Design a protein with these regions (language model features):
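Non-membrane alpha-helical segments in proteins
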Residues: 108-112
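N-terminal, motif-rich segments that launch catalysis or mediate targeting to/interaction with membranes
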Residues: 24-107, 124-169
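Short active-site segment of divalent metal-dependent hydrolases/proteases
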Residues: 113, 117, 121
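Long, charge-rich alpha-helical interaction segments
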Residues: 164-182
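General structural signal for secondary-structure boundaries
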Residues: 18, 27, 86-89, 177-182
C-alpha cells in the first residue's frame, strides 16, 4: 500500500485534479498535449497535410469519446474500437487516406497519436490500477479514470506550467466538426 501511495503521489498533485473540472474527459489533456508535441516534430512533408488543427486534435482523442456516448445501449463503441476493431479501424484509415483532403488526413494523423499514446501509457495505467484495486478491494472507485486524469494534471504542469483547472486545450476552442471528418 505504501509503495502504491508513493507512486500515486508522484502524479497526483493535491487539489488540482482534472476529474474535479466539470466536463473534463479522463486523459483528454494528455492526448492533446502528446498530439501537440508530435505535431511540432512532424517533418514538413507530413505536416503540410495536417494543417487543420481541429480535426487533428479531434483525432487525437481517438475512440475515447465513444466511452461516453452510448447510442446503441448494448455495446460500448469505445470498447469496440479499442479492443475489437483496431485492425479494421486502421485499414479504413488507410483506404480513406488515398486521395483524401487535408481535413481527413489531419484527423487520421491525430488518431495515430492517440493510439501510440495508449500503447505507451496503458500498460502503466493498467498495472497501477491493479495495484490500487488490490490495495483497496472493497472500494468502488474508477481507478483507471482517476490515474489517467492525474496524468493529465502531470502533463499540463510539466508542459504548460499551470494548474489543470486553468488549462484550455485547443479542441475545446474548436468550432464544430468539419464535414470531411463527420
Amino acid at each position: 500500500r505504501a509503495e502504491t501511495a508513493k507512486e500515486m503521489a508522484a502524479i497526483m498533485p493535491e487539489g488540482d485534479s482534472p476529474r474535479r473540472k466539470a466536463g473534463a474527459m479522463p486523459a483528454e489533456y494528455t492526448h492533446q498535449i502528446i498530439a501537440e508535441k508530435v505535431y511540432e516534430k512532424l517533418p514538413e512533408e507530413i505536416c503540410s497535410h495536417a494543417r487543420e488543427l481541429f480535426p487533428f486534435d479531434l483525432g487525437a482523442q481517438g475512440a475515447d469519446i465513444f466511452y461516453f456516448l452510448h447510442p446503441f445501449r448494448r455495446r460500448n463503441l469505445g470498447k469496440i474500437f479499442h479492443n475489437e476493431k483496431v485492425y479494421e479501424t486502421f485499414e479504413s484509415f488507410r483506404k480513406a487516406a488515398v486521395g483524401a483532403d487535408n481535413t481527413v488526413l489531419s484527423y487520421i494523423f491525430g488518431y495515430i497519436t492517440h493510439y501510440a499514446a495508449d500503447c505507451i501509457f496503458h500498460p502503466y495505467v493498467y498495472s497501477l490500477t491493479q495495484k490500487m484495486v488490490d490495495a483497496e478491494p472493497t472500494r468502488r472507485v474508477r481507478w483507471h479514470s482517476y490515474i489517467e486524469s492525474d496524468l493529465d494534471t502531470y502533463f499540463v504542469k510539466k508542459f504548460y506550467r499551470k494548474g489543470v483547472n486553468r488549462f484550455e486545450c485547443r479542441l475545446r476552442a474548436g468550432k464544430g466538426v468539419p464535414k470531411g471528418v463527420a
